[in-house]
């Protein structure tokens, strides 16, 4: 047997033998180990990311997770390759890799939590305003604000942005916004007049 086959056998033993060691750290080690072995001509990175997700599912004792480590790594490709190069070049210390991996898991979990919060808030908002008679333009703008989340729509919504988004006149935009304000769908922010902007009435989504 060649070196790769021997290493793969050790690798499979590592990921399959039950242990009380920290599952998140084991997921980090498994990912790095597979990348270093590099058993395939192509696709080693994708397989390593899939292995990470599998190991994290085991660590959390759940077949379903609300975040994807594969996606999180794809979103941080530059730092991912930087830390891999640092860890696999002239050192046997993998502490920096484990720290990066665990921080990326934490970031993925936080982002998933924020996404869930947005989805829940959006559902609650529309449930609360289910009986409001809103035109397609108003629904489009409200969905854009809801999808952006709290403070996510820079500068808030105003008549100019509304008119541009809905391809309508400023007069129509102002009338629609005033109607949304009267119906409690949005709240005003700013000093008033031309500087007035609007955001979703987030209190109604709690």
Role assignments for model-derived ranges:
Residues 1-116:
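Phosphate/pyrophosphate-binding active-site loops
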Residues 116-147:
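Short alpha-helical segments that sit at the start of domains
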Residues 151-165:
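Short acidic, hydrophobic short linear motifs in intrinsically disordered regions
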Residues 158, 188-206:
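Short, cationic-aromatic polyanion-contact patches
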Residues 169-170:
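Short coil turns linking two alpha-helices in DNA-binding domains
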Residues 177-178:
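Short, hydrophobic-biased segments on the C-terminal half of alpha helices
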């Amino acid at each position: 047997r060649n070196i790769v086959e021997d290493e793969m056998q050790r690798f499979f033993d590592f990921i399959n033998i039950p242990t009380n060691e920290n599952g998140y750290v084991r997921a980090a080690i498994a990912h790095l180990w597979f990348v270093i072995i590099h058993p395939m001509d192509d696709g080693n990175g994708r397989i390593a990311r899939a292995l990470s997700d599998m190991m994290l599912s085991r660590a959390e004792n759940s077949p379903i997770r609300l975040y994807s480590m594969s996606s999180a790594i794809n979103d941080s490709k530059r730092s991912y390759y930087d830390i891999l190069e640092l860890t696999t070049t002239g050192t046997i210390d993998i502490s920096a890799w484990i720290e990066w991996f665990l921080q990326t898991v934490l970031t993925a979990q936080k982002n998933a939590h924020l996404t869930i919060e947005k989805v829940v808030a959006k559902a609650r908002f529309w449930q609360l305003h289910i009986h409001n008679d809103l035109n397609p333009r108003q629904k489009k703008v409200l969905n854009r604000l809801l999808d952006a989340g709290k403070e996510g729509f820079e500068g808030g919504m105003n008549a100019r942005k509304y008119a541009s988004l809905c391809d309508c006149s400023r007069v129509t935009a102002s009338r629609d916004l005033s109607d949304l304000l009267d119906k409690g769908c949005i709240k005003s922010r700013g000093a008033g007049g031309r500087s007035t902007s609007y955001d979703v009435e987030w209190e109604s989504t709690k």
